[in-house]
């Protein structure tokens, strides 16, 4: 089980990403616009740098919904490998069965 502080930190990051998503997209559109002047693009780049560091989506880490474990995460199920295995053995995941050859 991950520390509660780490799980809360990830939730805080997710809120920041949602809060600043529109602003970031607007500034990035200006930066990548070839028709905009160099000064406008530079100003947009400076404003983008002024946004909180944690508002960038790449700062987020996928975590297991049950345990908060950051490694061994299966995005399709939203679970870590251990909890996914337990759920599969109980038959909680439809269509998933243990492989054997």
UniProtKB/Swiss-Prot annotation:
The keyword Secreted does not apply. InterPro entries: Ribosomal_uS14, Ribosomal_uS14_bac/plastid. Keywords: Ribonucleoprotein, Ribosomal protein, RNA-binding, rRNA-binding. GO terms for molecular function: rRNA binding; structural constituent of ribosome. It comes from the Bacteria. Binds 16S rRNA, required for the assembly of 30S particles and may also be responsible for determining the conformation of the 16S rRNA at the A site. Belongs to the universal ribosomal protein uS14 family. Part of the 30S ribosomal subunit. Contacts proteins S3 and S10. HAMAP family: Ribosomal_uS14_1. NCBIfam families: PRK08881.1. This is Small ribosomal subunit protein uS14.
